[in-house]
């Protein structure tokens, strides 16, 4: 069996059905956020979520700094938010492209069908 290259692997895993979320947190520089599809429930007792972020991500840095984060579950009409938060554009541009509020010290994107505010463990 041939070993797939990274491009082939990316194409295949991109076909896996999953919800789309934006993980958000505040840092000293303001709100940070990144599109994440590697998000799942980890436990019901206690209630825990698992989120996978790139080690070099500004959002991961913000999550670690804040000790809390939001998981914004995007709706069908929020494709623009998914695309903007998946890019490396300046944070100010990302946050100017969506309406958001501060809730429980976490940035929450308005219009999401659901969101979860989490503490870091």
Residues covered by each model-derived region:
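Active-site-proximal mixed secondary-structure blocks
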Residues: 1-121
């Amino acid at each position: 069996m041939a070993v797939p290259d990274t491009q082939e692997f990316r194409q295949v895993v991109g076909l896996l059905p999953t919800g789309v979320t934006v993980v958000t947190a505040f840092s000293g520089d303001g709100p940070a956020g990144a599109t994440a599809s590697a998000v799942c429930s980890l436990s019901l007792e206690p209630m825990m979520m698992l989120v996978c972020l790139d080690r070099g991500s500004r959002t991961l840095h913000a999550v670690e700094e804040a000790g809390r984060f939001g998981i914004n579950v995007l709706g069908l009409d929020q494709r623009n938010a998914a695309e903007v938060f998946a890019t490396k554009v300046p944070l100010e541009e990302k946050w100017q492209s969506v309406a958001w509020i501060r809730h429980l010290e976490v940035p929450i994107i308005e219009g999401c069908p659901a969101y979860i505010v989490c503490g870091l463990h």
